[in-house]
Amino acid sequence: MLKVDSKLDYKVADISLADWGNKEMQLSEREMPGLMSIREKYGKEKPLKGLKVMGSLHMTIQTAMLIETLHALGADIRWASCNIFSTQDHAAAAIAANGTAKVFAWKGETLEEYWWCTEQALTWPDGSGPDLIVDDGGDATLLIHHGVKAEKDASILDEKTDNKEFQCVLDRLKLSVAETPGKWTAIAEKVRGVSEETTTGVHRLYQMQEAGELLFPAINVNDSVTKSKFDNLYGCRESLADGIKRATDVMIAGKVVVVVGYGDVGKGCAQSMRGFGARVLVTEIDPICALQAAMEGFEVCTMANAVERGDVFVTCTGNYHVITGEHISKMKDEAIICNIGHFDNEIEMGYLENSKTAKKIEIKPQVDKWVMESGKSVIVLAEGRLVNLGCATGHPSFVMSNSFTNQALAQIDLAKNEYEPKVMILSKKLDEEVARLHLERLGVELDVLSKEQADYISVDVEGPYKPDHYRY
């Protein structure tokens, strides 16, 4: 079991990649106008000065730009990735070499290494924890909350589980609680708040809030319009195809692509695949989303109906086992399976991994062919984890500037204000400001309401222009 070394400055794959990372970061500046504006606006004020910020978010070039922004605002930063395959090693090297943050991330971590990186990023040299957290998927938040529970009742660490990753969490905490009693309670007490990036992480936060277990304030960045309607939709519309094509070189045109789930992510994925000429099937459990898909011209059917027809399967739900072992056994020979929702449990990977008869053949990193007893095979991308980050480089810089500008504003908000432990969202005014910061880069000009027009629809000339309940 790896032990935390709070005096370690970084652990990355190859520090010599820093120059490459810095050049790509410079290339991203023009594509990330929101973050650059935040630096310009708040750089002198330094609202995060004296505050410790921990990040658990994909260590990509775009995230490096967010880290540089938080550093420019005065933060003392430690960082880990939130996915074992999503780190861009040159981005991690650049941040480590620049001294912008203490980074613990590399592509291809084991699960044990992943959770070590998370605890390592949560532990400052004096043994203290962060004031603020930037989370993606809720893993940093989960580790703290489960650590606090374990310090109250160590027996929970002896729970039996078939989930390999959760077993790593229990093992990590067992070592931590034994070596540093009271560590997690002390960390939780000092956290001013967390800003959460994803649908999955937000779902976890609301579950904890409803159970009365949320230990510190949380800002739901995911449900900012300039995040969910842009990152989730337009980001996935580009990065899904990037991941599939880099991994397999498959011709998408003419293929049957099954998109599992038609939320914002699923909408982007379905549009992407149709744009490449695929025949797209959508599966849904929500009648509203199903109706939306049908009205967009997609065939909507059950998984039972789609499973024998699909050439490519994409899970977009954030749910559990939406592709089961039974589904996998009925798929066409060499059907491609991938996930762009969040965790690897959207696909029942245990059906393949625990099988005594299925044989795994690695084609190349993050592309595995599983040959089943029947003689048929399936091709699984990124071991069922995020295909756009495991097999490509994630969303483009411009759309991530939307998301990360929200993250920076959320961190400033949590730094300046003290809140009750509950889940909040950023104001509509800030949401509109994030959008406004990105218009010039696209050559967009806005009309302006007259005073009479503003009065007529009961808004201010400067906005916000829509009520909170408006659905974009």
Swiss-Prot record:
NAD(+) binds at residues 198-200, 232, 261-266, 284, 319, 340-342, 388. The keyword Hydrolase applies. It is found in: Cytoplasm. GO terms for molecular function: adenosylhomocysteinase activity. One of its GO terms (cellular component) is cytosol. Its cofactor is NAD(+). It catalyses: S-adenosyl-L-homocysteine + H2O = L-homocysteine + adenosine. Binds 1 NAD(+) per subunit. Substrate binds at residues 60, 136, 197, 227, 231. Its main location: cytoplasm. One of its GO terms (biological process) is L-homocysteine biosynthetic process. Its EC number is 3.13.2.1. It comes from the Bacteria. Pathway: Amino-acid biosynthesis; L-homocysteine biosynthesis; L-homocysteine from S-adenosyl-L-homocysteine: step 1/1. Pfam families: AdoHcyase, AdoHcyase_NAD. Keywords: Cytoplasm, Hydrolase, NAD, One-carbon metabolism. The keyword Hydrolase applies. May play a key role in the regulation of the intracellular concentration of adenosylhomocysteine. Belongs to the adenosylhomocysteinase family. This is Adenosylhomocysteinase. It comes from Maridesulfovibrio salexigens (strain ATCC 14822 / DSM 2638 / NCIMB 8403 / VKM B-1763) (Desulfovibrio salexigens). The lineage of its organism: Bacteria, Pseudomonadati, Thermodesulfobacteriota, Desulfovibrionia, Desulfovibrionales.
